[in-house]
From Swiss-Prot:
Gene Ontology cellular-component annotations: cytoplasm; euchromatin; MLL1 complex; nucleolus; nucleus
Segments forming a coiled coil: none
Originating species: Rattus norvegicus
Regions of compositional bias (Low complexity) in chain numbering: 7-16
Motif LXXLL motif 2, residue range(s) on this chain: 69-73
Post-translational modification: Transiently sumoylated, preferentially conjugated to SUMO2 or SUMO3. Sumoylation causes nucleolar exclusion of PELP1 and promotes the recruitment of MDN1 to pre-60S particles. Desumoylation by SUMO isopeptidase SENP3 is needed to release both PELP1 and MDN1 from pre-ribosomes.
Sites bearing Phosphothreonine, chain numbering: T757
Key word Transcription present: yes
Underlying gene: Pelp1
Motif LXXLL motif 3 in this chain: 111-115
Annotated Acidic residues bias: 786-798, 896-967
Protein name, per record: Proline-, glutamic acid- and leucine-rich protein 1
Amino acid sequence: MAAAVLSGPTTGSPAGAPGGPGGLSAAGSGPRLRLLLLESVSGLLQPRTGSHVAPVHPPIQWAPYLPGLMCLLRLHGTAGGAQNLSALGALVNLSNAHLSSIKTRFEGLCLLSLLVGESPTELFQQHCVSWLRSIQQVLQSQDSPPTMELAVAILRDLLRYASQLPTLFRDISTNHLPGLLTSLLGLRPQCEQSALEGMKACVTYFPRACGFLKGKLASFFLSRLDSLNPQLQQLACECYSRLPSLGAGFSQGLKHTENWEQELHSLLTSLHSLLGSLFEETETAPVQSEGPGVEMLLSPSEDDNTHVLLQLWQRFSGLARCLGLMLSSEFGAPVSVPVQEILDLICRILGISSKNINLLGDGPLRLLLLPSLHLEALDLLSALILACGGRLLRFGALISRLLPQVLNTWSTGRDALAPGQERPYSTIRTKVYAILELWVQVCGASAGMLQGGASGEALLTHLLSDISPPADALKLCSTRGSSDGGLQSGKPSAPKKLKLDMGEALAPPSQRKGDRNADSDVCAAALRGLSRTILMCGPLVKEETHRRLHDLVLPLVMSVQQGEVLGSSPYNSSCCRLELYRLLLALLLAPSPRCPPPLSCALKAFSLGQWEDSLEVSSFCSEALVTCSALTHPRVPPLQSSGPACPTPAPVPPPEAPSSFRAPAFHTPGPMPSIGALPSPGPVPSAGPIPTVGSMSSAGSVPSTGPVPSRPGPPATANHLGLAVPGLVSVPPRLLPGSENHRAGSGEDPVLAPSGTPPPSIPPDETFGGRVPRPAFVHYDKEEASDVEISLESDSDDSVVIVPEGLPSLPPPPSGTPPPVAPIGPPTASPPVPAKEDSEELPATPGPLPPPPPPPPPVSGPVTLPPPQLVPEGTPGGGGPTAMEEDLTVININSSDEEEEEEEEEEEEDEDVEEEDFEEEEEDEEEYFEEEEEEEEFEEEFEEEEGELEEEEEEEEEELEEVEDVEFGSAGEVEEGGPPPPTLPPALPPTDSPKVQPEAEPEPGLLLEVEEPGAEDGPGPEIAPTLAPEVLPSQEEVEREGESPTAGPPQELVEEESSAPPTLLEEGTEGGGDKVPPPPETPAQEEMETETEASAPQGKEQDDTAAMLADFIDCPPDDEKPPPATEPDS
């Protein structure tokens, strides 16, 4: 009749039309449909007057279909809602009527099952007690097993819902549960399984109310522990494991926790006793239970020896399951687990092997039972791992030894079978691999699996054996005539061919009976355990293990895809193929640090795996490809390399802009990436012609800033003099002619600039002499790892500074940092730095550093270049023109945040210090003194100083050439041919600058700082004669600083500094003492001049090379140490 109700309306009205007979409106279709369905079922059981559906069959004929009808009604969600209360009430009446009759009891229970699950709360509370009474009557009636089973299922639902309602919970606990348990205990043996189901529901939902019957329940459960029915035995174990929670807080004078622990110890004692009975005289040193537990009183067994062993085995199995369930089941209170005692039992069981069993008498029977006992022990170990988790790590070594021990015990006879047959002991090995996966899943890399040792090697051997597909036993044999099985010796003209001997018992694969999925379970378990271990412990696994896995997995995947191993191998199963791909992905995601992952081969394999017949396998391969693609080709660039290092160029006031430019965001973006080896990017726009001195490719090595002596002369860009600048030495920008400075910058600027855009050119009027000088870049052949680690936010004096072309001469030789996004002026190359601190500022400054000879005082225009904080490294000299371009033009890769913060504060101090330094230099040389005054005036005297700067540049070039020829001849070859930059800032000091290295000079404060270190170190005899005495001390101080940080000789120190810019920073800090960035207002040219004047007399005495090195080293510390250096120098 339900079909008739759901059928369409009669002709004359469209289906579903509101007015059609039988039609359901859209608004009320759901409730009305449910009502019609309920009435339809009621009509099937008993005709009802006024029903929309007329009865067609007697109710009894529908009895066999009622369970299915109840399921269909649940699918429609018939119950619930006020609209259905009337229909549900009718069903309640029908159910009660049918339950009262023996003939219709089953139909009444079917209706009651629907009512209990679908009735609303009010209806359930109203009828729950009456339904419980009806169920109890059914249990006492000793009806047929199907009826009893349905009644117990309804009882379980009733107790589950009633336990959620406090009123019903109290009522049932006090008045009804004792009678229900008594009825369940009295069921006949045929209904024992139903009785155990009902008892399990009672002890689960009403544990306190069951406490008064705890003794009877325990006896009932124990008597069923050795049942031969697996389902009955499992139910008895589950019920017994819940006994400790029965009763109130105190059960028979014991707390729940104490009761649980006592029960656990009793189980352990009983298991030890049973094990001793099973394998008496087979254990060499049996472990006895030392716990406080008392052995359980089990029913006596029969006298027959064979039967006794089987009954003992059943009891042992049941008690072991009870122990595992107690460990894995939830308990209402925290308890203490005797881990050591449980592990002792497990080790005792697993320690019994076939070698210990005497095959006489009952030995074969004991040997037959042994695998089952080992499985019980492994289940117990699994439950213990789940219960205790990572707290078992102290026993990790024991667990790591147990697994390969069990595999060794059950590995005999596995290779003698032909393909297509299940190997023996596969179930035990599957369980071992499942425990391996669980142990690694719980403890991660701390599990220590496959990380060396004899146990790890043994485990790996078993894993590879179970993963490898079996091979048909084909042997090469000689012709029949050969007696020794070797090749027949005969005429050389008639060689004999080897033939395949398949053996007598081995037929061709097409003629053999076999299981195509044989050993698929153990193979899949081994693959899962191995893939989990590699994924969690891959980097800790030995390199040799990774290579062995690569050699096995990659060819196996290819063979599976080509169908070469699918004949009778476990890889016929899609589950094994899926786990094989999962293992391949784990090898990619967690490779060994010394063994590269097989990425290209894996990508090919995953691509082909997408065409697998199994949807599960193909879907996993697609997901693996997505994962690999995200790793190899990220759609979003990594954070460190994303975005330009410098913000868009913006005009900034010359003196104060540097601090703002140094915003952390600027440092974070691009400078770090640029520090790494810099491939020569597109040429950076430069004002002057770019001489082809050194290969731009050398710029890649630029990032590494280490002492030159340690490295072979880098073939990097030529200095301003046209000499190739060795990787260790950089020429001060003031000394470098603008055109040559641009030489390297044009090629490297894009690379150095995070944005990769060439720096915009600055109007000629903003540059010195109306033309844009080009900075010379120092390129290093070798890139140090520490160089890559240099960050924009580092506090080191070693920094790469990119100055816009528009800036006045960029005195800061220390930083030849790549220009940020698009520096305007041609980049200036940092002056050659002494071996010690050379690395700090070597970062090529492709950025538009103002004329590499930044010594000219003109701070005019955006002299400050504040953003990159070139100021601390000589921004005043180089940052004259581009206050607006600070963000893009000046990048201080190694600059420190402290210097940036202190720049503004020290700007005034640096100016004063520069003035003092200039006065001292005036005493040494009148030209330098005039240059100092010009630097103070910067913009006003800028043009006048250009002529002097050009002359000085020529002298400096000559000195630099000599210096490079002496020490850096190899490096000097690169850019000697470079034409001297046409435009030099007027205030550039003469040839001494290479040694003085304007890095400290860029800002007067830096010069002071350099002078302070110099004073500490003492005057350096190596400084060029043109350099002021202050510069010499600073250079020596720099050298001392390089030496002090590194215990090794100065060359070693230089190498260390070049490799690790942070060490350079420290040196700079020591030498400079002040990381305060010199104010952009102070002309970098002034600083450079002062340094050159101070170092000039001493520099003449020193070797030109040594002077250049010392000067370059002094520059970074000078940035940090403002005026104090000058006094010591003097």
